[in-house]
Curated annotation (Swiss-Prot):
Species the sequence originates in: Fowlpox virus (strain NVSL)
Name of the protein in its database record: Poly(A) polymerase catalytic subunit
GO biological process: mRNA processing
Active site residues per record: 194, 196
GO molecular function, one term: ATP binding
SUPFAM superfamilies in alphabetical order: Poly(A) polymerase catalytic subunit-like
Amino acid sequence: MERSRQVYYIINEYLGRHPSSTEYQVLKHQVEKISKINNFNKETFFFLLKKNKNKFFKDLELSDDLLKKRIDEYFSKQKHAKRLGNLFAIMELQKILISSFTKTIGILTTKVPEYYHSTIKLEYSSMEKIADDILDSYNVVEPSKEVKGRHKVSDLVGHVYKIMEEYLRRHSNSCLCYGSYSLHFLNNKIEYGDIDVLQTNARTFLINIAFLIKFITGRRIVLLKVPFLKNYVIMHDEETNHVMDTFNIREKTMNMIPKIMIDNMYIVDPCIQLLNMIKMLSQIDRLEELQAKFEKLSVRLGTLLEYTRYRYSIPLDSESILEVRAKLDKDKRKITVDFKKYKLNYIKCYFYLDEVELKKFISKNSGLDEYEDFEAVTNSEYAIRNKTMYTYFSNTALMRSENEIHPITINALTSHALLYHVITRKFYDDLLGDLVRSLMIVEKVPVFKIIPRDKKQGRHTIIDIEKDIIFH
């Protein structure tokens, strides 16, 4: 009886009123969580937010009274919830905030150990002309006349960049970056826009960032999970302007990804980024944008090539080039590539153009020789059985004739296979060298036909702190 009274008191304190019988029956199972929220030290939290404000939002006017008011209003929000679903959303978000904010975002205001600026000194200009020639050979489709929808950038982005730069240094075991921001550390000629990151705790991180922005600025932030990309979450402001995005990956994947440390932060090994860039260029809309982005892409490609040549000891004067045979099965939407020349742990690879077909194969075959899922890093699983690799190719496949696959797609397919080898650190030497040297053989081939990529099904799910919605 004493325990029941104690539970009732805790729920009553949380709601600021007597719970209904339904509320009591549901909330009594959450009483430990509720008790922690009731006992949360809002005064300490206030001082922590002030430190974040002074470090990351210096130019913003914010009085202590207004900040305290916003904190009090949010931690009283459950008292005004009309529906049980909203009450649960409030409680879940409050629980995440009180249990993770300090170690996720709060720590960014503490003194960081001194570090020395470091970079890899390579002569990237030597690859600039080669990169120009490679991209010129890829410039084989007309620019699209369709106006592409590009996300509008929120005015909050500058603040978030400062937070992300600090976060990458403090949380290097759970977060690493890739893309133009990471490559800027290798070659300062590379301009960057977004800071692209992979994380093992993306959901918790983004919720805490959303709360920080809410308390400091009063702005509404929405987190949108996109079904078409693996564990991809976008952050929008109240006008759907883009704030940031991130991919979530498992800790196992994070540990496997080859990475290098520059300025106390980890970046995805540029060889992995090179292979993903070559792979992505098989996507028709990327080729349609090539002319408009030529200079920017050329600097990036030249940097990635020079790093890969140096780090993986690739002799460019060797006469050995890519020797693979590729064949499309139009009805089954499957491409078979023969890798017989190379000493791999398989002889050929089936690239499914529909992900569901790969998943069917994996589910029907429990006795696989090898299996890996690198999630968003490769956007596919890899399975090996009886000297054959099975994987999924997520981009458009280009044809040079009715029955011949275009060299751009052959390079992309090879890159996709190589991602498996470079990440697992085995059997990549000869194939990687041949691919890099083959890129330098300029052959401008028109695109005869485009095999579309598969269409993903699903719906967007959201987390909206302001509206008390949590659907992912």
